[in-house]
Amino acid sequence: MNIADGRQAFPAPAKLNLDLRITGRREDGYHNIESIFCLIDLQDTVYLKSRDDGKIILHNPVDGMPQEADLSYRAASLLQKYARNPAGVEIWLDKKIPTGAGLGGGSSDAATVLLVLNRWWQCGLTQRQLIDSGAALGADVPFFIFGKNAFARGIGDRLDEMDIPKQWYVIVKPPVHVSTAKIFTHEGLTRNSASSIMPTFQNLQPFRNDMQAVVFKEYPEVWKAYSELSRYGFALMTGSGACVFTACQDRNSAYNIYRQVSDLYEAYLAEGLSKHPWLSV
């Protein structure tokens, strides 16, 4: 969508980890995972405006964060070396995805910047090259570039499309920010889950999140939110938290739960997507 001042709007959807297992620690300090990634229609909007002077300007960085540290800024900077002509861009972020929530908002914004600028700047990078580049920005970025619901391996950069039944989700965000680094370095974290032999949506049930127990111990607020949501059905934490969610087969069922929990917590009602909205642009 074009805006009067020349900006164009692009979607950046959130994700849920419907299952997340840690299968080992790598020599470089990172962890190998296996996870089901599902796109949802809760999304940020990334506004971009091209410049021809080589400057990258992020107009509304997160409070207290220099623009050079923002993933969207870093994504644009990363692509500049591949641009055919001196290329710049102005970036505005309309944030609807809560931060520090395990929903991948910052990573999705960065992936959208990579996808758009790869086209605008005629960088010519393949999807695989974009995924490899995006992995340097964050573990969730490759999934958003892949653009379809997926089973992820490695550090999240080995992706296979997975068919996920259409579902609605009620997402609850407790009033706490979870430190991903703290959880991944915790001595109590499970790091030896068995790798899946035939990973399908059905075969991986019952779903789990290997980080959940540690997060509950270190952040009681997440446990409280999980306990409340569990009253209505099977609940699970996404990513390293802090959000927890439950799935429903139809919107009415999800909305009834949402009405109850939204009186107690910041809550979201979201529909599952089969592909990134960018694929329809």
Swiss-Prot record:
Q: Which SUPFAM superfamilies does the record cross-reference, listed alphabetically?
A: GHMP Kinase, C-terminal domain (SSF55060), Ribosomal protein S5 domain 2-like (SSF54211)
Q: Which reaction does it catalyse?
A: 4-CDP-2-C-methyl-D-erythritol + ATP = 4-CDP-2-C-methyl-D-erythritol 2-phosphate + ADP + H(+)
Listed binding positions for ATP are: 98-108
Q: Which GO terms describe its molecular function?
A: 4-(cytidine 5'-diphospho)-2-C-methyl-D-erythritol kinase activity; ATP binding
Q: What's the protein called, per UniProt?
A: 4-diphosphocytidyl-2-C-methyl-D-erythritol kinase
* Family (UniProt): Belongs to the GHMP kinase family. IspE subfamily.
Q: What does this chain do?
A: Catalyzes the phosphorylation of the position 2 hydroxy group of 4-diphosphocytidyl-2C-methyl-D-erythritol.
Q: Where is the active site?
A: 15, 140
State the pathway, as annotated in the record.
Isoprenoid biosynthesis; isopentenyl diphosphate biosynthesis via DXP pathway; isopentenyl diphosphate from 1-deoxy-D-xylulose 5-phosphate: step 3/6
Q: What are the record keywords, sorted?
A: ATP-binding, Isoprene biosynthesis, Kinase, Nucleotide-binding, Transferase
Q: Which domain of life is it from?
A: Bacteria
Q: Does the keyword Ribosomal protein apply?
A: no
Q: Which HAMAP family match?
A: IspE
Give the UniProt record's GO annotations in the biological process aspect.
isopentenyl diphosphate biosynthetic process, methylerythritol 4-phosphate pathway; terpenoid biosynthetic process
- Under Enzyme Commission nomenclature, its number is 2.7.1.148
